[in-house]
Amino acid sequence: MRRRQIALVMAAAMAASALSGCGGSGNSGSAATAAPATTAAAASEAPEAGGESAGETEGADGEAASGDKEGYLSTFDVAGAGDVSLDVMITSLGDSDGGPFLRGVMDKYMEMYPNVTLTPVECSMNDLYTTLITQATAGTLPDIFTMSEAYSANCLEMGMMVDNLPELLGEDYMNGLLDVAIENSTVDGTFVFMPWQNNTSAMVYRKDLFEEKGIEIPKNWDEFLEAAKTLTEDLDGDGKVDRYGSAFAGTRNDSAESRFQTFALTFGCDFITPNGDGTFTSGFGTDAYKNAMTTFVRLATEEGITPPGFVETGYSEAYTMIAADEACMFFSASNVLGGIYNANPEMKGKMGSFPMPTAEGVSPVTSFSSVGMTISNTCENPEVAADFLKYLTSVENSVAWNEATCRLPVVKDALTAICENDEVYNGFVEASDSAVIYPPFAGLAELRDICGECWQTVVSEGVAVEDAIANAAAKAEETAKTYSN
């Protein structure tokens, strides 16, 4: 794994005065000066933001069209582009919080430019990969579609997207993004997708209950277990647990499986390691993976700290449990707070976040990932598509997006504004100081699914955990070989 000590760029911007309102517990000073470590080879592979043209597309009069009046970095004469129709497939369109917001942004853009028609296309994140493969094979990709690092290598390999995305977005826009987000969106020197959501993983928790019971923030998984046991209670005296210490996602889909990849990191396990010669080595046969999977299953099913039904508990079920005062902790990106608040607005002010616990002997670590969008290679109006994406992710819209969903952006100025205003994100900021990004690997979705199959066979079919792990290791080794040159 390419490990990066990732201090969010906004920490540097806020170091002089604002970190007291947003930083983590005592570590924000180091975050202010740290920067993503980059090898010479990695630096040579990174795309130049904007290229020679600085991303400015000339309008009919030969001058770059200015979008300052609209509050975003528009560099194309959209109004002079004639009638334009774009299909926009963003996975959040189907969300109860993000969907209405996105449709509102699309409507406002069409009000600004009556010559543009934006058609929303829904697709769940869990169905994204298979949907894109089908569409790419049939030549029916939408003009704009969701992309993440889990599928970016496949996207590049299949030639799904335009090959000049930095130029379309422009140098000024690219310079406003977190450096780590740009790196995370880059495969073999090609900028594959425009990052949008900052998905640093941390633990969200009932801050009010921790304070009420005098529980200290757990630094390792043993301390996490003790905290969860303290929080697990029979509140009405009927002999049944009413509130559990934690929730774990155990469904067999990318949402739960990607969380386990973060969990495995905290045991020192890298799913996949590039060998530098086009081949890869799986980490599933290591003691770190065995310890991670064994502990994951034990915490989720054997310690009595989680609600029943682990393998049926997905992301939405987990945040609903917290909103209903049935669980107290869950690790995720910041968007889980939006789900909790949506389900129960009274939870605002009661929640907090802290960095992921780790296994004994493992330094603090978490994962950084980003969901974003890219433009199809079949799009007939890529300049207009890029202009809409810049409007969607403007500082104003990014802050409003956070208010609607609690998702953190990768636009530096927007991230600064959000974190200055709400300490609930402190744990995510502190966690960013020890975050890593995953290496591009076209078989990542397959490795994750092997993990989901592993814990589900243990819990649902009674397979011994040692046997399930051995089977997973064998499958992961084959996957690594399949995608090696």
Language-model segments: residues:
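Hinge/lid segment of periplasmic solute-binding proteins
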Residues: 48-80, 124, 148-201, 216, ...
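Conserved C-terminal helix/tail region of periplasmic/extracytoplasmic solute-binding proteins
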Residues: 50, 54-66, 211, 301-304, ...
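Extracytoplasmic "Venus flytrap"
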Residues: 72-80, 86-103, 254, 438-442
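Short, solvent-exposed loop/beta-turn-alpha elements that line the ligand-binding surface or hinge
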Residues: 78, 163-177, 236-237, 245-254, ...
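Extracytoplasmic "Venus flytrap"/periplasmic binding protein-like
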Residues: 104-177, 208-219, 320-321, 326-329, ...
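Extracytoplasmic/periplasmic substrate-recognition and gating elements
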Residues: 107, 111-112, 117, 212-213, ...
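Long, aromatic- and glycine/proline-rich binding clefts that accommodate carbohydrate-like moieties
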Residues: 180-184, 351-355, 402-453, 457
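Glycine-centered hinge/linker elements that transmit conformational signals in sensory
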Residues: 228, 278-310
